[in-house]
Amino acid sequence: MFRNYIKTAIRNIRRNKLYSVLNVAGLAIGVTCCLLILLYVQDELSYDRFHEKADRIFRVATIIDLKDRHMNFASTAHVQGPMFKDEFPEIENYVRFNYYGSRRVIQYKDRSFTEEKFIWADNSIFEIFSFNLLKGNPESALVEPNTVVITEEMAEKYFGQEDPVGKNLRVHNETLYMVTGVMENIPMNSHFRPDFFASFSTLDLKPTGNPAEDLMSNIDYITFVLLREGTDYKELEGKFMGFVERILKPLLDAYEGEARYELDPLTRIYLHSERQGELEQTGDIAYIYLFSGIGLFILLLACLNFMNLSTARSANRAKEVGLRKVVGAQRRQLIKQFIGESMILTITAFVIALVLVTFTMPLFNSISGKTLTMEYFTKLQFVAGFFCLFVLVSFIGGSYPAFFLSAFRPVEVLQGRLRRGTKSSVLRVALVSLQFTVSIVLIIGTLMVDKQLNFVRNRKLGYNKDHVIALRIRNEETQKKYEAIKTELLRHPNIMSVTASSSLPLGRNSFSAHHAVGKPESELTMLFSQIVDEDFIDTYDIEIVKGRNFSKDFPTDRKEAVIINEAAVRKLGWQDNPLGQQIEVFMSLD
């Protein structure tokens, strides 16, 4: 009997080639889009879950509230890890990262490259994180100063077939770092992927003896802690308040501020963190919800299209249903037949969808910035999900046509008196209306995203970023030769201006407490600042509303002059006349 259902279904599909092609094509395209989105979402949700101790790894975050500024840092001071481990027995170990200025010029013999991901880390990194060393001893690889562990990729890049261990890399043409280990390339689904881990002891950081100042100064270090088994991290967070009260309260009271520390679960950082100073760019859980919704909408649209095409042909198949009922076919047999046809069309569409995913994945990767592969399709969880999706789509896509067609009365059909009930008409209209609604929602959403991207690309930033090339100069010897380099560059006919600054206009700037002279010392204003030369304003085409630019004609400008923006004027309360006012820098948090 089942074989007859299949034969009949295949004959009907062959007899209606155009309808079958349209149905399969629509469903295949919809499933293709849904699968690509599913792969993207699955990859985003998998970040940092490959670490064996992921459920016990937490990042320490610093939150500081002053009267005119809320600071939410992903970083801490360098003393945070050691102090917390000594203070709280729930903390088994810690690891610190210093990533500020992570771009470095690395040299080995005649090979020299500028690397973007050079950071310092404690040796405990290999105990806490699942970064596997292929060469070297994880217990001592980063204990000594001026040692470095590199990835497989970097080992091949600099050393080729040589054994890197024991060799020296020159950093910024100054410091030599001995390679003490080679580790596997860090997986793409890690929220930070350095190529070089240099020993934290190289930085030679020592406490000043004033714990409060140590904790509130230079909040530039990412600190992860490994909690002991069974520790409730929320309870531990509550204990941090006693630590703050005991050590930081006098300093915070002087600035009329508050501070607290929070723990971020490792597996939530990539999608849920909204803190300043992340190791690398993170994702956003809102996009996961958005793309998941889009994927479901597309799949729903494909199913609705499948159902509408099937019901639209109901009149053409009415006589077939009537004849089958006359010769004894029962309704449940007809339902099985139509569901069988739906399953054949669906499985054909799914197979085509898998082929389309294979061919479109490189394009999708280039657009999304991912490195997705078909490997995920071989996992049991995907196979189970794919089968459930197939059954669901087959049933949803074929259920209404099956129940609708099988309900025809044979006498009315054969006598040409087929009447379509009001309920059926209403349902078909509802399906078509829903299909158009989903389509319109997707189109409007696409247009909104496009307009938002155009706004971001074209919004005015307050400075000119076009035709500007930025070069980082870390080497002190090169910095001393800046004026000579500047003079040489300006000789080129295509270079109009050259300037130097401590950071880019929207880069990582110094963050400090400022006091307006003449006001009570308790009134502090937190401001970002950077050091620039007299050509900075002109190079970036920044408009000066009041006053003048820095000038070499005024030697005091180099140490005693500042230019502030309109936002700083409002914060300092100088709306009437900011020119000639004086400010002092108190506490620095960078």
What are the language-model segments listed below?
Residues M1-V21, E278-E280, S310-V351, T358-Q479, ...:
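Alpha-helical transmembrane segments of integral membrane proteins
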Residues A25-I29, E139-V143, K552-D557:
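Glycine-rich loop motifs involved in handling phospho/adenylate chemistry
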Residues T32-L35, I294, I298-L301, V351, ...:
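Residue-level signal for the membrane-embedded core of alpha-helical transmembrane segments
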Residues I37-R103, A212, M216-F224, E237-G238, ...:
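Membrane-proximal extracellular/periplasmic loop immediately following the first transmembrane helix
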Residues L279-I298, L380-Q381, G385:
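N-terminal membrane-entry
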